[in-house]
């Protein structure tokens, strides 16, 4: 196999694969590829992987070369499909691998990191491995893996949530201060009780009580004119 020509073309792996996929014919290869999820190795192809948006998951591949000639693993990609309609939802970023040469009857391992950022739903992940074989870059699809993707639960102590809470608190505080300055002060001034000053009365004037002037008749004679009193006395 002319690996020198293949390795020279590795910088254009994606373009080469695209040309092969559109114009090339299918080739039967005796290459077995399987993978497991590093974070949840107990998940098999019959199980459903529970993934969270914003997290990264590592696929650990094992490639077995049962061909009579040497092969080379040169890249990996994949896609998320709708498991019901089989329509492609999104493609994974194509990553270059090695190249890693695999002798006949041998196996190698490599990893692929998958960034999960999808609308919460059920998907089927189908990875694809690029293999150089017989002077061609061949795309070998792997088994599908069902995955249920959900959004991450927001913690009360999440820095993003704390920042949002501070922003809202500052906003409401500013609005409250503005309302108080515009209407609050005037309202409080209009409803506050007014203290009326009490005028103090002057010092009490002592009233001298007139001593009653007694008379034989038994009534007060102080108000009777003196001339009249003298006249009455003469008559008496």
UniProtKB/Swiss-Prot annotation:
Transmembrane segments: 162-182
Entry keyword annotation includes Mitochondrion: no
Cytoplasmic side: 183-236
Keywords: Endoplasmic reticulum, Membrane, Signal, Transmembrane, Transmembrane helix
Superkingdom of origin: Eukaryota
GO cellular component, one term: endoplasmic reticulum membrane
Membrane topology term: Single-pass type I membrane protein
Signal peptide: 1-19
Subcellular localization, as worded in the UniProt entry: Endoplasmic reticulum membrane
Role, per record: Is probably involved in a pathway contributing to genomic integrity.
Protein's UniProt name: Increased recombination centers protein 22-2
Species per Swiss-Prot/TrEMBL record: Candida tropicalis (strain ATCC MYA-3404 / T1)
Gene responsible for this protein: IRC22-2
